[in-house]
Amino acid sequence: TALRVREEKVELLHTHCPIASAILARSLREVVDAPLVLTYHTKYDIDIAKAVKSRLLQESAIRALVQNVNACDEVWVVSRGAGENLRSLGYEGAYTVMENGVDVPRGRVSAAAVAAATAGYDLPDGVPLFLFVGRLMWYKGLHIILDALRALREQGQAFRMVFIGAGGDEKEVRAEVETLRLSDRCFFTGSIADRETLRAWYSRADLFLFPSTFDTNGLVVREAAASGCPSVLIAGSCAAEGVTDGRNGFLIEENAVSLCAKLTALCADREAMRRVGENAMRELYLSWEDAVARANERYAVVLDRYRSGKYPKHERFSDEFFNTQGDLMEAMSRVAEMRGETGRLCRELREGFDEAREALREKLEKEW
């Protein structure tokens, strides 16, 4: 691979993961004379915490991640919030916000296309339709959606809710819909890969519900905006960047009460949903082509800075890699020692309990 990269005369390396692919990119940079750009997409500390239970190993993994980021010549983040998350992990260098675009055109699809895509679902005319598109995981704010819908139903408000996507929590989400007695108005389509079918759902929906604080960019918000569907988002979240409440989207607090209140008000003002959706289409939409054009312009800046020697020299990857591996192995050793100590204490407690139980039994036998 290294030989082929050298033969291809690569001018720039770009990685989209600060872990595995960043390690590969750093090793390749020692073979080719090219700058390395990294795009930081997601809150890796949350992913690491889910995958690794040991606090020591979590901290070691995050240090390794930050070292990889520091080793890059330029760092891009998909939102200001993503940059703040990276800062919270210990990164102190500069970064550039480079927003992602969407690969769907601006504008709603035809009524016929909407009818074809949504056929078979009970979606009465005049009844507000809410939509969620994404992985069916609780951390996407799905509890907030379901609890708000339950309260909305209890108020007597008619509505329909469609979930598009799949995920590790799908079975639990479906079960919760049954428990809350929402199955007559909540539907699951599964994953939809066809872009035109997705556009049809966005075009049919009155509101896109996305109360997630996990996502660093929320491309689905721009996809919805492309079809004139306004989003309901958590104020201060990454997905809500660029959104003004009541102008090009709707903002709520991170709880079901706030979402229910917003939905109640909007169900009584369908014109507001339409108007804000039009503004979202004009103001939030960013095409993939425009995003790529901006990236290409920035590449030119990176190359100029690299050739001018404006980027600092970085430690050889091999040296830093082995240092990092040493730190990680030390952390693993400390975890093992802690587990061993915990096991020893448990054994001592168990042995002490057995001794006390035996002494008590002997005492009772003597007394009886």
State where each predicted segment sits.
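Aromatic "clamp/platform" in nucleotide-sugar-dependent glycosyltransferases that forms part
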Residues: 213
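Short alpha-helical donor nucleotide-sugar binding micro-motif in glycosyltransferases
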Residues: 69, 191, 199-205
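A conserved mid-protein helix/loop that constitutes part of the nucleotide-sugar donor-binding site
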Residues: 128-151, 157, 161, 168-174
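A short, well-ordered alpha-helix in the C-terminal region of glycosyltransferases
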Residues: 272-286, 290, 297
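Short hydrophobic beta-strand element within catalytic cores of glycosyltransferases
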Residues: 230-234
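Carbohydrate-associated surface elements
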Residues: 81, 101
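Conserved acidic donor-binding segment of nucleotide-sugar-dependent glycosyltransferases
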Residues: 245-246, 250-256, 265-270
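Nucleotide-activated donor-binding/catalytic signature segment of Leloir-type glycosyltransferases, i.e.
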Residues: 174-192
